[in-house]
Amino acid sequence: NGVHNASLLTMSVQSTLVSEGRGLEIQSPVQWSCSQPQDIADIRFMSTISLAPLCEVEMIGGQANEAITIGTSASFSLISTLDIEVLDKGLPVEGATIIVDGQTVQTDALGSATAQTTARTVDAQGDVQEGTKTVTMQIGSFTEFFAWNVQQSTSHTFMASTVPSGTISSWLILEETWSPYRLEGDLTVASNTRMTVNDGVELRIA
């Protein structure tokens, strides 16, 4: 996790920024002259940014909340990333649908998916900063939501635990850790066993 702190960081046309590991934090004001489009990632700009004419910068991940000034035909865009995980009692759920900002993705065999959205654009049209967007997770009729402040890349885990349908013959305990649960069929608890729903558990019946 690198940190740059000086009175001013001046970058010439040959300069670029590379972030490794847990990212680079730049606490200094930045003045950047670039002659070709710059693609950077995971840099936290904690102070102002000034781009010279024709300097185009696109950043995936990271942070840029302070004032950004641009010269003629220059631009800055921040694309935020959301890493999603969907679990069923701790096990990955493949094929869950994730919807955010009109984009639809499916979780893979590891229960993971990634979504991206443009969080900020500074160009000749002005400075457009997006706010909170709703992330929807769907498995059949089961739906969960997450409010994502897109100014910050982040990760989120959805729980989508299943309750077995049919007749259960062993003690079934629903734990808050894996809530919410979903039941998609008839459930019968045999007379010689029991089902325990712990405090804080949410059970949804389709």
Put a short name on every predicted segment.
Residues 62-63, 121-149:
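A short, solvent-exposed loop/turn motif at the edges and junctions
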Residues 102-125:
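Short, acidic Ser/Thr/Gly-rich low-complexity loop/linker segments typical of extracellular
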Residues 73, 145-162:
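Extracellular beta-sheet/turn segments enriched in Thr/Pro/Gly and aliphatic residues
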Residues 1-6, 22-34, 39-72, 76, ...:
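Extracellular beta-helix/beta-solenoid repeat scaffolds
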Residues 96-101, 135:
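Hydrophobic beta-strand segments
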Residues 161-171:
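Boundary/junction segments of secreted and surface-exposed precursor proteins
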Residues 80-82:
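Structural beta-strand segments of beta-rich domains
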Residues 84-97:
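Structural motif
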